[in-house]
Regions:
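S-adenosyl-L-methionine-dependent nucleic acid methyltransferase catalytic domains
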Residues: 1-247, 254-255, 261-399
């Protein structure tokens, strides 16, 4: 049975459910920025269910229930200390996340899991499905910011976290923390620690078979100031360029930087090749001059763009344009599984590509709709907001 792939559409719902509705090898490029870990509470509209069993009649309980009534190792994931460091601005107890007593499913916001290992596992589930729907010639571009432990974020409770430092998320029972004491104690969850969440996610994707081609530094030229006094201000984020096969579409010439040459009168003509002499390190030879421009490298300095609509973080359109210019073939389908305010979809729309978004929050879907409407000359009649799918359901990929 041939399954028609939706195009120029926003699918509203759980990202895993919507991805599993898509057929294999149907997307050319994935451009996305996932929720960052432990930084922001987006409200009850962003709550979803992860892990556990789909047919379970869930019996939800809070962390406090698990802590006071005991639930094996789940007790550890529920424990937060009442002790607080002086000088740290702790928020009120956030994230009314819950656990199912029957199947250990977890109900909460992606990015507000009680332990970073659970967050990484949830993202790994998503990107395994993305790997299935991505064409062999396709690519994944993932932006993810980092988090400091014990600061002003939602999870700034160092003492409570120290009990989790040796807990390991295991696949024996979905959603449960299985206690596995390490011979050497790992104390990486300490106050003021930069958690390296993007790197940990990237390694998890490599374990799935993804091929990491570049870690690009997105230098935010007009980055936000910070009030910290004992470290440097953050001015960049990671942008990972992944592929699923060693033969993939990539057009470097489309994003080359023009040569900055200003030859006035009396200047010698520049040769397209230049010889270099033999040294102790090199055997000598020639280096080529590409008339189309220079390789832009892996540090991209781009200015953040303001957004009138209510959304906390949005891609710069120039960043998405550069990505699609080098990685999207003519007539390609662009997917953003965490569409947010829809910047990647909007840029794809402007550039004449087909696009597909997935977004959990209805009000963000409305924002996307309004932004696309402003540029409706291309293909507005193809836009629809889909809250349900009649596409043949695909089983999740297991590796």
């Amino acid at each position: 049975m041939i399954v028609e792939v939706p195009r120029n559409t926003v699918l509203q719902g759980h990202v895993l459910d919507k991805l599993r509705d898509l057929p294999n090898d149907c997307v050319d490029v994935v451009v996305t920025s996932t929720p960052y870990y432990g930084l922001r509470d987006y409200g009850p509209d962003c709550v979803s269910v992860w892990d556990g069993k789909a047919d379970c009649e869930h019996e939800w309980v809070t962390r406090e229930y698990l802590m006071h009534n005991g639930r094996g190792d789940c007790q550890k994931s529920a424990k937060f200390s009442s002790q607080r460091d002086e000088g740290v601005n702790y928020p009120d107890e956030p994230k009314a996340d819950k656990t199912c007593l029957k199947c250990s499913a977890w109900k909460g916001q992606l990015g507000l899991e009680p332990h970073p290992s659970m967050f990484i596992e949830h993202l790994a589930q998503v990107f395994l499905e993305i790997k299935r729907v991505l064409k062999p010639s396709g690519s994944l571009w993932l932006n993810l910011g980092d988090t400091y432990f014990g600061g002003n974020g939602q999870y700034g409770r160092p003492e409570g976290w120290k009990d989790l430092e040796n807990d390991k998320l295991s696949g024996h029972a979905p959603g449960e923390f299985i206690k596995e004491r390490n011979k050497l104690r790992s104390n990486w969850l300490q106050p003021k620690q930069k958690m390296l969440i993007p790197a940990r996610v990237a390694i998890a994707l490599q374990d799935q078979g993804w091929i990491l081609r570049n870690e690009i530094v997105w230098h935010k030229v007009n980055h936000m100031p910070e009030s910290c006094r004992d470290r440097l201000t953050r001015s960049w984020e990671s942008l990972y360029f992944f592929v699923k096969d060693d033969k993939y579409y990539f057009d470097l010439n489309a994003i080359r930087n023009p040569h900055q040459t200003n030859c006035g009168s009396g200047t010698r003509k520049i040769s397209q090749t230049q010889k270099f002499s033999k040294t102790s390190c090199f055997n000598g030879g020639t280096t080529s001059y590409n008339a189309m421009g220079a390789n832009p490298g892996d540090v991209w300095a781009l200015t953040n763009e303001g957004l009138k609509e209510e959304h906390f973080a949005a891609f710069p359109q120039k960043l998405v344009k550069r990505i699609l210019s080098c990685s999207a073939p003519k007539g390609g389908l662009i997917l953003d599984p965490f569409a947010g305010a829809g910047t990647s979809l909007l840029v794809a729309h402007k550039m004449g590509f087909d696009w597909l978004g997935i977004e959990l929050v209805p009000k963000y879907c409305k924002i996307i709709e309004k932004r696309i409407e402003r540029h409706g000359k291309i293909r507005l009649d193809g836009f629809m907001l889909s809250t349900s799918s009649e596409i043949e359901r695909k089983q999740p990929c297991v590796e």
